[in-house]
């Protein structure tokens, strides 16, 4: 997917930040997530990311840790590769499972062990800081002014674009990830929504508290 033609089109369209969903450079994990055949081996992805340095103002590598079958050595190898790539920004989220995706994740990856999460996170911080600075709990940037697309500085925010999430007037909404459907709805003068939820006062307080923890 990271072809030269597509990347140049993005750059020429004034896109200045590219976030690449890597998850892990471990081939075993990539195969279990059904990403190896789609996007290539960890070595291929790492090489492509290294070639992307300088094409955009910000190159973000989006990673996940605490996979059920992941051990500390596997995580350290991911960190070794990231250190070599020298991306401007790295996001490292723990594997998060919702009730809707739990069965699928367990079937593909196994049962999640929360006992490793703290130890793995400490290793990530130890390796990335001080070369990187905290932008949020999960986001590490070489420059303090860089953004994390999942973190906002305002009580309310509008999500524009395919797959974006917004929160306005106590309503949280998500736009469709399907780009053709998004374009079709916009052309029809309709909101390209995939899901909405109206928060109660209690929900609003809890949501605001959670957002401020970041």
Residue ranges and their predicted role:
Residues 1-214:
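C-terminal scaffold of the Radical SAM
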């Amino acid at each position: 997917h990271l072809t030269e033609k597509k990347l140049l089109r993005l750059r020429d369209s004034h896109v200045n930040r590219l976030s690449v969903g890597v998850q892990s450079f471990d081939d075993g994990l990539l195969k279990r997530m059904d990403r190896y055949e789609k996007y290539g081996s960890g070595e291929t992805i790492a090489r492509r990311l290294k070639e992307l340095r300088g094409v955009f103002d910000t190159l973000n590598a989006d990673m996940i840790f605490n996979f059920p079958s992941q051990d500390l050595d596997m995580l350290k190898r991911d960190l070794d590769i990231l250190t070599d790539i020298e991306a401007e920004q790295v996001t490292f989220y723990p594997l998060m499972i919702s009730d809707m995706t739990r069965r699928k994740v367990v079937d593909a990856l196994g049962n999640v062990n929360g006992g490793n999460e703290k130890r793995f996170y400490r290793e990530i911080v130890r390796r990335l800081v001080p070369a990187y600075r905290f932008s949020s709990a999960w986001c590490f940037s070489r420059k303090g002014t860089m953004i994390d697309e999942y973190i906002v500085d305002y009580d309310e925010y509008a999500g524009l674009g395919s797959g974006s999430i917004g929160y306005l007037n106590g309503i949280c909404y998500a736009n469709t990830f399907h780009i053709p459907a998004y374009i079709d709805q916009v052309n029809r003068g309709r909101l390209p929504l995939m899901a909405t939820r109206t928060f109660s006062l209690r929900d609003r307080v809890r949501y605001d508290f959670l957002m401020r923890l970041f």
